[in-house]
């Protein structure tokens, strides 16, 4: 991947959507929920504060995160799907 996020943006690789239900039924593509968790693959340098200093990012590459269902912008690079979102769109770090 050749993407470098700017400011307080984060690039997340969404986890794969569930293929089947707990009961063993396969879910068609039209019925799959968008994943709300994934792995951080790149982070920007941070957001500039009003006084000009850069506030460091809390999330780091490799962390698993939870985010809103409609958070971020979907992009495809080299056949892989990613989300670009602001750090504030991330609700929690898993683990």
UniProtKB/Swiss-Prot annotation:
GO terms assigned for molecular function = ATP binding; metal ion binding; protein folding chaperone; protein-folding chaperone binding; unfolded protein binding
Q: What spans are recorded as compositionally biased (Basic and acidic residues)?
A: 12-22
Paired cysteines (S-S): none
InterPro entries cross-referenced by the UniProt entry:
Chaperonin_GroES, Chaperonin_GroES_sf, Chaprnonin_Cpn10_CS, GroES-like_sf
Q: Where is this region: Disordered?
A: 12-38
Localization recorded for this chain is:
Cytoplasm
Enumerate the Gene Ontology biological process terms.
chaperone cofactor-dependent protein refolding
UniProt keyword Cytoplasm, yes or no: yes
Q: Which superkingdom does the taxonomy of this entry point to?
A: Bacteria
Q: Please describe the quaternary structure of this protein.
A: Heptamer of 7 subunits arranged in a ring. Interacts with the chaperonin GroEL.
Question: Which protein family is it in?
Answer: Belongs to the GroES chaperonin family.
HAMAP family in the cross-refs: CH10
**General function of this protein:** Together with the chaperonin GroEL, plays an essential role in assisting protein folding. The GroEL-GroES system forms a nano-cage that allows encapsulation of the non-native substrate proteins and provides a physical environment optimized to promote and accelerate protein folding. GroES binds to the apical surface of the GroEL ring, thereby capping the opening of the GroEL channel.
Name-wise, this protein is Co-chaperonin GroES
């Amino acid at each position: 991947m050749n993407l470098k996020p700017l400011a307080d943006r984060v690039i997340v690789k969404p986890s794969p959507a569930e293929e089947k239900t707990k009961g063993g039924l396969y879910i068609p593509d039209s019925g799959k929920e968008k994943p709300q968790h994934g792995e951080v693959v790149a982070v920007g340098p941070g957001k500039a504060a009003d006084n000009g200093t850069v506030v460091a990012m809390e999330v780091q590459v490799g962390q698993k995160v939870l985010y809103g269902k409609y958070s971020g912008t979907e992009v495809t690079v080299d056949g892989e799907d990613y989300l670009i979102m602001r750090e504030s769109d991330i609700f929690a770090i898993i683990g």
